[in-house]
Amino acid sequence: MSQSVLHLRAPALECVRIALIGLGSRGQKTLERYRYIDGVRFTALVDHSLEHLEEAQLILERSGRERVVLATQDSQLALASDEVDLVLICTDWYSHATLACAAMEQGRHVALEVPAALTLEDCWRLVHTAERTQRHCFLLENCCYDPFHLEMLARVEGGDFGELKHAEGAYIHNLQGQDPTELPRDHQLYHWMGECYPFAGGNAYPTHGLGPMAQLLGIYRGDRFTSLYACASTPGLPLTQRHSTVLLQTERGRTALLQLDLHSPRPYSRLQSIVGTEGYMSKYPLPILQQRAWAQALTGEALLEELRTRPRSPLASFVAEGDAKGVPNVMNYTMDARLIHCLREGLPLDISAYDAALWSAVIELSARSEQEQHPLSLPSFL
């Protein structure tokens, strides 16, 4: 019988040896991010393009790292290498699950870009492979490392909001180009949600909003999502032009709202709200923290300054470290540094294979719910 990987502790790694698969825009940006991360060494690079492989080598050189000997167009060579501990997967959406499972079968830990999978079948495949191999399957969901979210999570875990009732999350980002009827054709989301996308509706990009909400609600850590209902305001339009709304309910009776909107002229927002019997906190559109006992809410820059100067998150040291290093994006740095820290110390990861599967499963389930026009049950991957 397979063992759970929810709190998996793998042997500590003195130096994490990394294979990076996928050296397009996302992969090259990942290499650039890792110039700030200690305790790692890149031992394999994989891409179909020889030009991308050379560009990646130059990025490593500019960041003071050695060129990689194993630079190949064949991912299987990298996965089979005994010089690899962790495989970073930055390829197209459709290959994430297959590459992740192949890496775990070879005994490698995996960190993959969002989403982890597009279908329920592949979500289950990730979970079963992680359990059988006892390897980490980490989802690179950087919004779970937003300093604001980390401080919100610390206050939830500290009981500041009383009994939780409701959470909201989203990815609201106007990506339309000069032609208001479509996204710019060179934008990544245009391709990811294009002709090969397997579903006609639903929320195709759920993890930025759902991941932080799941952590706040303690999903798989005391509660679980049980049902989902999805609808779209403009179902006749192409997927990138719709407004998707998903409502979820948990076993303990809490609710969650998840939205995706890539086309309307709304300001950027991930909502990031939590409601409890004793308080409320939200990042967008204006940061606000309200406790029942307070006469006045703490808002805007005053709240952000409070969170910066009196942090309560156990991950605050990573945020401070990123600030001190002057990293371009402290959210990404915190995610990367925390992942490597846990692998080097033999600690459980913050995001498990079960989380990666559940957050990604909403893609297919929301599409089915929207099409069938009724709620659906969510599987418990744990």
Language-model features, listed with the residues they occupy:
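N-terminal Rossmann-like dinucleotide-binding module
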Residues: 1-63
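Conserved acidic residues
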Residues: 43, 69, 85
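Predominantly a Rossmann-like dinucleotide-binding segment in NAD(P)-dependent oxidoreductases
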Residues: 22, 133-136, 143-237, 373
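Conserved SAM-binding strand-loop segment of SAM-dependent methyltransferases
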Residues: 67-74
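C-terminal lid/capping helical subdomain adjacent to the catalytic/cofactor pocket in oxidative enzymes
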Residues: 357, 374-382
